[in-house]
């Protein structure tokens, strides 16, 4: 695999994806970020088995491929690179070479085939809602959202679309009626 991206695009995508990398896990592959350049776009995927994030990065694919790299090490390398184009190249043993101007880093990688993939989500027609309406919906339920992130699912709100109607659900964790 060989891809070329700007540092700013890489850093933005990696920092977003880093939110789904667990700090402690019994599965080392979950500490990785999957770089997938097997199609015509570059995808970064992270997954902690509760939360999964996929970002698409603008860049050039010179050789198609896929590799899983340690997400925190990869982020620290990208963060310290000069503001220029970054080349990421892997060999047949999944070792990655990251170069930017005079900087060159070699880090071991893993096969992307071992990575825990995200489920496919059908993306139908987009829903348009006014900012005022969305703000009011969130304002009316924000009090019930968990403050700590022991369970990440409880720190958000669920929006469902059924029969052209928007259903808004907030899981009451702090404020429950008994």
Predicted segments with their positions:
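Structural preference for solvent-exposed beta-strand-turn elements
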Residues: 1-166, 170, 174
